[in-house]
Amino acid sequence: MIQGFATPEGTASFASKAMAHKENFRKIQNLTLSNIGIGTYLGNPDLETDNQQKTAIKQSILEGVNVIDTAINYRAQKSERTIGKAVSELIEEGKINRDQIFVSTKNGYVTNDGDIPEDFMQYIMREFGKKGIVKEGDISSQYNCITLPFLEDQLARSQKNLGLDCIDLMYLHNAVEGQPQMSHDEFIHHLSDIFEFFEKQRKEQNIKFYGLATWECFRVSSDKPNYLSLSEIIELAKKIGGDNHGFRFVQLPYNLSFDQAFMQKNQLADSNNQITFLEAAIHHNIGVFTSVPLMQGKLLEWIKNNEKFTNQSPSVDALQFIRSTPGVLAPLIGHKLESHVSENLQVLKIPPYTEQEFYDLFKKLTG
């Protein structure tokens, strides 16, 4: 197990030595984090993908990315293991220190193990059912489970997979979307217990921060049953953990097609005024990481044929727009092929848009 966690001193040192443009780092919770992160969602659970992903992670870190995101169910635990190998190799090679990089993962979805050739349900019964970790009714129709025994088991597995004794950020993974049968009040009751669990894990230095990784709940209108209020969640965190609570980050989809976080006024600023999710995140100092920046490649052709963008590559244009959006900490880009990694990381060589440049482009796109 690699000891330690991301620190203000370590992340600042990483930024000062990075090949990336100096404006491509942002301060949050006293940490200096790159405004591009590595995502590890896509890919088969096989050795070829392991090797591609490991090489991509190492190349990304060496070129100035110190945010790495995964989830225990990504590639059936193999993405976590690949990150662990990449990080440990870079540390052994003397190229980074543990305190320079920020690693996030997610727990909540039930997954098998890509390294064990066993039927999915047989694995679940053997690993969780027979051991009493999950019981009948715990797992939703979406294969999501948010009971404390399950989350405790998953945290320990994530630590082992990553080879890290402390995970910088642990997300509860798509809990609203993964528990469609649960009422709002019932969900908040469960979330209260989970936040207590996370605060305990912080005290034991198993995690530094916690957050919610989401798909729809922060992007839908407030009249929808799966809507969540950010201020309500923050108040819950304060009630459980006090002013120094660990709920400091959210992940949600945001790109040139999924623009709700920036456009839709669905959060309350006060009793009279509604603001967007990203405005609410700025107000509460919540770090927002964004997923699906390229819509798994579907946006690239549209960008390529849109003369309103610069002459950068389509992926750089997409990443530049997202990371320059006020309130966004960093988009998480999943890449494995060396050519894609090199192309995407060109964005690190240029500064993000100024706020004026961003709004000028936004007006062109929406005009």
Language model features with spans:
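Fungal eukaryote-biased detector of long internal structured cores
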Residues: 144, 150, 157-160, 164-165, ...
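Beta/alpha (TIM)-barrel catalytic core signal, keyed to glycine-rich beta->alpha loops juxtaposed to Asp/Glu
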Residues: 2-24, 149, 156, 173-367
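Active-site-adjacent "subsite" loops/lids of carbohydrate-active enzymes
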Residues: 115-149, 316
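Active-site mouth loops of central-metabolism enzymes
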Residues: 39-52, 136-152, 180-185, 304-312
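Residues at the N-termini of beta-strands
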Residues: 35, 67, 166-169, 209, ...
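Structural signal for hydrophobic
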Residues: 38, 101-103, 158, 167, ...
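N-terminal binding-site loop/beta-alpha segment at the start of enzyme catalytic domains
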Residues: 1-126, 165, 182-185, 189, ...
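Catalytic cores of glycan-processing enzymes that make or break glycosidic bonds
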Residues: 134-138, 145, 159, 171, ...
